[in-house]
UniProtKB/Swiss-Prot annotation:
One of its GO terms (molecular function) is alanine racemase activity. Pfam families: Ala_racemase_C (PF00842), Ala_racemase_N (PF01168). This is Alanine racemase. It is an enzyme of class 5 (isomerase). CDD domains: PLPDE_III_AR_proteobact. Keywords: Isomerase, Pyridoxal phosphate.
Amino acid sequence: MPRPIHASISLAALAHNLDVVRRHLDQAAQAAGGAPPSIWAVIKANAYGHGIEAAVAGFSAAQGLAMLDLAEAVRCREAGWGGPILLLEGFFQPADLDLIDRYHLSATVHTREQLDMLAQARLSRRVDIMLKLNSGMNRLGFDPDAYGSAHARALQLREQGVVGAVGRMTHFACADGTPGVAGQLRVFQSVTQGLADGPVSVCNSAATLRYPEIAVAHGAQAHWVRPGICLYGASPFADADAASFGLRPAMSLRSQIIGVQDLPAGAEVGYGATFRAERPMRVGVVACGYADGYPRHAGTGTPVVVGGVRTRLVGRVSMDMLMVDLDPVPAAGIGTPVSLWGQDGPSVDEVAQAAGTIGYELLCALAPRVPVKRDS
């Protein structure tokens, strides 16, 4: 018999979250008197741990998909996705352009070397590109003083039949908090003002939820947003949970109690004996540890749901197991279901906060050894 741990991926929750984002953007567009943007559903890192094929099915109503990895883009095509696909880091060597050509992909361009590779490529069709501006995050993109010349070269490649649409994009560093997006948005608008029309994309999850008005399209200008984490039912914000936006968790990590210990007062639990029972208590052993993707740094007090009752983790997380306080669940015993996070448990963001990290990391870190079930 396999260990009693598995992750469930809800396709209905994925579709619901996409619809929540779409309605949010529709309302912003109506208020601003413009048109709502199109949505690139971001499915990088194996769809934030949820699986590429599940994401293709769950996000079937999106206008496009965005990711980093060429192999994942190919999997999308093999899963039946026929719409636009954007490679968020573009390409790294000339051979990548052969796959981009074959599978009809679009690419982010953020270096002169990528423009050089495009100029030397022999492709069967034009490649749509998004020219990225470094507006202040200082990660990827052309600096403001180099962007104009890079854009001009992209237009030359378009005239030569190599490039199709030439879009403009940037990435916000602080859309989830202070100082927000105003400074970077000013840089983006100043640098790109007057450049030839093409699609524009500036909003990630946080900006899409908090500043949807900046993605509203006016006139013939096409806008795209790039929501990621919110589509999986987790929050990009430290000060607002996903449920407050109407989002539902798409991944649920579940296991069972596999052992019970009746402890006297003063007994210690787990590696390092970091937890000591203040009174006689029952402790349950759960088949889940850091080798399954549960955060090792989650300490005593991290929320867990056992048999439908909220309780707490006690002691250190082991490689394959963790321990929970069963006093709030007197009927619990071996075989009692446990929800580590998800639809019937604490939110992944709660667990992440207790471990000093973010929900993104936990979702992406689900271990390959954990069986995954897809729910419709």
